[in-house]
């Protein structure tokens, strides 16, 4: 795990690489394809609101992030292979752990999933 401050330098290219799923695909919220879309939105949000993430990190110094995010950020390349394998619970914890999840991230994630034809359903 690494702090957000150590992953900031290369955020720019990460949001571009999520492969689109076929139209009208229904997946579990913990499906890796859903996680990759969520992480793409998350990284894009970090880039767009870097100061807020720095302030959040300063207020929560023990909050850590999966090292794969840092590796993807610093590589500047296709991040999908780097971010595969991050457990769904870690993806959820990182993304929902910021105060702006409900107002900014959740709507952006819903939009990105819909654009890729991905709909989520909680398994019974």
Swiss-Prot record:
Keyword tags: Cell wall, Cell wall biogenesis/degradation, Glycoprotein, Secreted, Signal
GO molecular function, one term: structural constituent of cell wall
Alphabetical list of InterPro entries matching this protein: SRP1_TIP1, Yeast_SRP1/TIP1_CWP
Superkingdom of the source species: Eukaryota
Pfam families assigned: SRP1_TIP1
Induction line: Induced at low temperature and during anaerobic growth and completely repressed during aerobic growth. Induced at an early stage of fermentation and remains almost constant throughout the entire fermentation process.
Keyword Transmembrane: no
An example Gene Ontology CC term for this record: fungal-type vacuole
Protein localization: Secreted, Cell wall
Keyword Secreted: yes
Post-translational modification: O-glycosylated.
Gene Ontology biological process terms in this record: fungal-type cell wall organization
Main location, first listed in the record: secreted
Position of the signal peptide: 1-20
Purpose: Component of the cell wall.
Protein family (similarity comment): Belongs to the SRP1/TIP1 family. Seripauperin subfamily.
Entry protein name: Seripauperin-23
Lineage of origin: Eukaryota, Fungi, Dikarya, Ascomycota, Saccharomycotina
């Amino acid at each position: 795990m690494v702090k957000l401050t150590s992953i900031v330098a290369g955020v720019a290219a990460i949001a571009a690489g999520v492969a689109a799923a076929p139209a009208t695909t229904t997946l579990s919220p913990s499906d890796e394809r859903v996680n990759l879309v969520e992480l793409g939105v998350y990284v894009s949000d970090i880039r767009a609101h870097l100061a807020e993430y720095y302030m959040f990190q300063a207020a929560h110094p023990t909050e850590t992030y999966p090292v794969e995010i840092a590796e993807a950020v610093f590589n500047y390349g296709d991040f999908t292979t780097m971010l595969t394998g991050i457990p769904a619970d870690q993806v959820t914890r990182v993304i929902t752990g910021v105060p702006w999840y409900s107002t900014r991230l959740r709507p952006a994630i819903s939009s990105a999933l819909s654009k890729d034809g991905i709909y989520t359903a909680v398994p019974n």
